């Protein structure tokens, strides 16, 4: 099983950016924890982080027909990234949307996700471990 892990704008600054909201774990540390768990389950992960929506869409197009699922934290693109949402929709694979903070307990503009309606599920507010929970879902799906 091959999964694509997409990280949106500003996630490259995890560990430094507002640690009281997003925690002190770096993106590299999150990816390393995911890679370790995935490897033991026989799952291959490809990671991409970009601050540019078009790069994320191009990445989806490059992986079309080559992956079995997507784990995505769209960052601020969650709320208005329509080209990203459309790119995700054309992939025809399960998508799990992850957010480090509980977006529904924050500012009202963060409560709407353009991705949620096309995602299999959403994990919000469980910190960096939310990525591992998303990966667990794919591991269980692979085993079924």
Curated annotation (Swiss-Prot):
Pathway field: Metabolic intermediate biosynthesis; chorismate biosynthesis; chorismate from D-erythrose 4-phosphate and phosphoenolpyruvate: step 3/7
GO biological process terms held by the UniProt record: amino acid biosynthetic process; aromatic amino acid family biosynthetic process; chorismate biosynthetic process; quinate catabolic process
Site (Transition state stabilizer) residue list: 17
Binding site for substrate: 73, 79, 86, 100-101, 110
Gene3D superfamilies (alphabetical): Dehydroquinase, class II
HAMAP family documented for this protein: AroQ
Record protein name field: 3-dehydroquinate dehydratase
Native source organism of the sequence: Herpetosiphon aurantiacus (strain ATCC 23779 / DSM 785 / 114-95)
């Amino acid at each position: 099983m091959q999964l694509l892990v997409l990280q949106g704008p500003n996630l490259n600054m995890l560990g430094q950016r507002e640690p009281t909201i997003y925690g002190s774990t770096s993106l590299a540390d999150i990816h390393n924890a995911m890679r370790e768990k995935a490897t033991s389950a026989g799952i291959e992960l490809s990671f991409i982080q970009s601050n540019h929506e078009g790069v994320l869409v191009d990445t989806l197009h490059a992986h079309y027909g080559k992956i079995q699922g997507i784990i995505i934290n769209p960052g601020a693109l969650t709320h208005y990234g329509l080209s990203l949402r459309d790119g995700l929709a054309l992939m025809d694979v399960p998508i799990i949307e992850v957010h480090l903070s509980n977006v529904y307990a924050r500012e009202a503009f963060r409560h709407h996700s353009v991705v949620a309606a096309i995602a299999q599920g959403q994990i919000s507010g469980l910190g960096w471990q939310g990525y591992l929970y998303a990966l667990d879902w794919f591991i269980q799906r692979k085993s079924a």
